[in-house]
C-alpha cells in the first residue's frame, strides 16, 4: 500500500507531494518499521549515542511537525528546520523541480517556514526526549530574508531553542537567501562562530554548534574556514548544502541542486576538510547518498555521520531500513569491527 502511495505522490507537483507526505505522517499513515540495531553501527559523538550514522537532512521537517514519525521510519537522527524568527512564505512557486533521470532535485524554497514560536511549540508538544531517548534531534536555524543583521536573528533563535534539541546548526549556505553565503567569508564566519560560542557560554550550555557549508566555496575559503574552525574548536561542519552549479542537469532554473550530481563534489569537500583539520572537526556528510556504498564512501573520506534527503523522497519510507541493513552487511564484509573504524580511511 505504501509503495503505491509513494508512486502516486511522485506523479504530483513536488511541493504538493511533500505537503501531503507531511500530513500523512502527522496522521500516522506510514509503515511502522522495525529492525534490530547493531552495535557495529553505533557511535558516541558529542557525548550522544547515535544508533546508526544515518540521519535526515534539514528541509524536510521545517516546522518540527513530524519528529516521531520520521524517527519511527528508522533514522538515527533528524534535523529540523531551517527555522527563522518570523514566519516567511519563501520564494515564488513553482520552487521544487524533479529530475528523475539524474536522481536530482532543484529547489528555490527560500527558508519557507511558520516561524520560531510555532516551531518551539511543536517540539515541546512532541515530547520526543521522553519517547525517543535513543534518538537524536538537531535544530537548523537561519535568518529572515529581510533581516539586516544576521547575528540578531541567530542570537534570538539560539536563546529560544538551544534547550530543545541535541545540537544546533547555523545555516550559512542556502543559495536561496540573498547574501547568506557571504557569511562564509573569513571575517564574517569568524564573527558568527565567536558570537555563538559566547552566547552558549553565557547560557551555561554545552550544546554542540555546527555550521552548514556551501559546496561552491573556493579553495581559499576552505582553508580559511578550516583554520577558523580549528582555532575556535567548533563542534562540527555539515558538508554540504545544495549547489548553484546545475550544469549536470543542464538547467538554468534558480535554486540549489541536490541529489546524485552533488555526490562527488561533496565528497571532495569532505575529504579536503578532513585533511585540512587533521580529522579534528566532526563532519556530517550530505549530498547524493542513494545506497550503503555511498555512505561508506563519504565516511572513508572523513564523515562521521551522514544525512539523506533527495534519495528518501525518491525511494520512499522503506529506504532507511534498506540503507541500514545494507550498511551493516557491507561493514562486516569489509572486515571492520565498528563503523568508527571507517572514518577517514581514504583521506
Where are these regions (language model features)?
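Glycine-rich phosphate-binding active-site loops on the catalytic face of alpha/beta enzymes
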Residues: 76-88, 172-174, 236-244, 295-322
